Each structure stands twice: as C-alpha cells, then as structure tokens.
C-alpha cells in the first residue's frame, strides 16, 4: 500500500508495541460487528437497517484498516514535540489513505469511516503518550485526543455556507455535534459512562458479550447519534433513546433470555430504518480502551 509521508522525526517505539495496539484496534472493530443481536446494526444475524452492507464487508474493512493503525501511532510519536492542535492536520492524509483502502476493500461501502476517525485519534494519542513517557490510561488517551481536536467543532460545524454538509445541517437543526464534538470533548460518553459501566458488569461476572450489549443500550440511550438523526430526524432519535432507556430500566441485558428484547428492538429499528452507527463507533472505543 502507498503510505503518505508523516514526519522526519524518528520514534523510539518498538515495532512490537505499535503492532500490539494496532491489533487491539482491529479486534475492537471485529468484536463490535460480531456482537449479536444489535438493534438496527449489522451483526451475525442480519444486516440491520442496512441494505448496502453485510458482515463480510465489515470483516474486510477492519482488515484493511488494521494495516494503517500503526501509521497513526507512529505519527503520534513522531509529532510528540508539535503543539497538539497541529497534529490533526498531519493525521488527515493518513486517514484519507486509510479510508481509500477501506472503500477498495468493500467495493465502495462505508463501513468504518467513523472508526477511522476515532481509532486514528486514539492511536495517535497513544503514540504521543508513549513517546513522551507519559501515563497511558483511558483518560489520558482521550484527553490527548481531545487536545488534537481543539476548535474542530467551531471550524467544521459552525461555519455557515450555502453547501451544508450533513453534519453541519444536523448541528444547525438539532445542535448535534456528532463524532467531532465527542472527540473534542475527550469522549465523555465513553470515559464517564460506557467504559465504567462495561467494566463494572465484567467485575460482577457478567458474560462479556452480554456486558457489551448492555453497554450498547446505554450508549444508545444517551448519545445524540447523528446516524440515527440523519435517517429518522429528531423524532427517530428520541424514539430510539426512549426505547433503549426503557430496556435499561427494566433490567437491561443480563441473561440470554433478555436477548429477545434486543431482537424485538432490532425489528423495530429495521422497520423505522434506524441504525445507531455512532453508538456502535463509541462501543468500539469502549472495548478498545478497556484493554489498555
């Protein structure tokens, strides 16, 4: 694959360490897509509310992206002496090249564009922290990623022009900041909610898949998911949030019998053409950070 230039600075990071974190990113993507049943999302059972993609597309996409994750880590390390606000500019060509390989692997299907952005940021943050010999925890990784994105929401969502992007339109209509806003804030939905929730369930001895499904419900209940809003408007988003919250209030996903509730929720999401892709992206980050 053709690699864009990154930096003339050298990194002291061992290749084995870089590959270890890249492997975790790949495993995080596979863990999310294979998790079943997921309301409105592609999984091992069906294609959710998607008519243009299948499970195999996500497997091919994750493999293509895995080859680029070391580059994000390396750039984070090589740019460690740069001001954090300058890092995002250098990450963009790597992200675009990674995106190109994703589209080639899936014959044009957008499977993981959001994950390229979020995992790319976290991998770059990991590289920076390792290079600077600073503490590497979920919180420091996310706060470092946030420092890369300072001002991003203002620059890309609050700009008024005649050709509004989907993200700008949702921001102006519903004040949803999506993936950009979550990144700039340091992923609070993950750090303050999803990750502690998931780890608590694991500590209680809950099956890891059930714990992840329950954590997905939590994210769906609290996330202003632009994927859902773009398909179903504000009404669709509020409906999905209410349904997820209701399931959590009834006890969530604790046993195999509880999966029937998710299957019904899945059918309703498919009927309404709603897919909580933004929450799925955050679930990928939750699992990834839980391994650090």
Swiss-Prot record:
It holds the Pfam family CitG. It catalyses: 3'-dephospho-CoA + ATP = 2'-(5''-triphospho-alpha-D-ribosyl)-3'-dephospho-CoA + adenine. GO terms for molecular function: ATP binding; triphosphoribosyl-dephospho-CoA synthase activity. GO terms for biological process: prosthetic group biosynthetic process. Its EC number is 2.4.2.52. InterPro entries: CitG, TriPribosyl-deP-CoA_syn_CitG. Keywords: ATP-binding, Nucleotide-binding, Transferase. Belongs to the CitG/MdcB family. This is Probable 2-(5''-triphosphoribosyl)-3'-dephosphocoenzyme-A synthase. It comes from Shigella boydii serotype 18 (strain CDC 3083-94 / BS512). The gene is citG.
């Amino acid at each position: 694959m053709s690699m864009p230039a990154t930096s003339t600075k050298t990194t002291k990071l061992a290749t084995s360490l870089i590959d270890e974190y890249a492997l975790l990113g790949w495993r995080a993507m596979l863990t999310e897509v294979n998790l079943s049943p997921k309301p409105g999302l592609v999984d091992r059972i069906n294609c959710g509310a998607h008519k243009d993609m299948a499970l195999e597309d996500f497997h091919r996409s994750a493999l293509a992206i895995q080859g680029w994750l070391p580059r994000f880590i390396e750039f984070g390390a090589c740019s460690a002496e740069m001001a954090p606000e300058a890092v995002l500019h250098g990450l963009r060509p790597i992200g675009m090249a990674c995106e190109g390989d994703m589209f080639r692997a899936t014959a044009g299907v957008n499977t993981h564009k959001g994950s390229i952005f979020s995992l790319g940021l976290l991998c770059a943050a990991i590289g920076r922290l390792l290079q600077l010999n600073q503490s590497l925890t979920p919180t420091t990784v996310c706060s470092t990623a946030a420092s890369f994105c300072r001002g991003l929401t203002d620059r890309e969502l609050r700009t008024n022009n005649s050709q509004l992007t989907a993200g700008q339109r949702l921001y102006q209509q519903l004040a949803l900041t999506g993936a950009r806003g979550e990144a700039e804030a340091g992923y609070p939905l993950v750090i303050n909610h999803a990750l502690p929730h998931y780890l608590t369930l694991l500590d209680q001895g809950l099956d890891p898949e059930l714990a992840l499904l329950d954590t997905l419900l939590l994210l769906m209940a609290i996330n202003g998911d632009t994927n859902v809003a773009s398909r179903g408007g504000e009404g669709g988003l509020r409906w999905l949030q209410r349904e997820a919250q209701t399931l959590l209030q009834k006890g969530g996903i604790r046993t195999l019998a509880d999966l029937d509730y998710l299957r019904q929720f899945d059918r309703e999401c498919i009927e309404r053409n709603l897919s909580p892709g933004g929450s799925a992206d955050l679930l990928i980050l939750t699992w990834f950070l839980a391994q650090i």
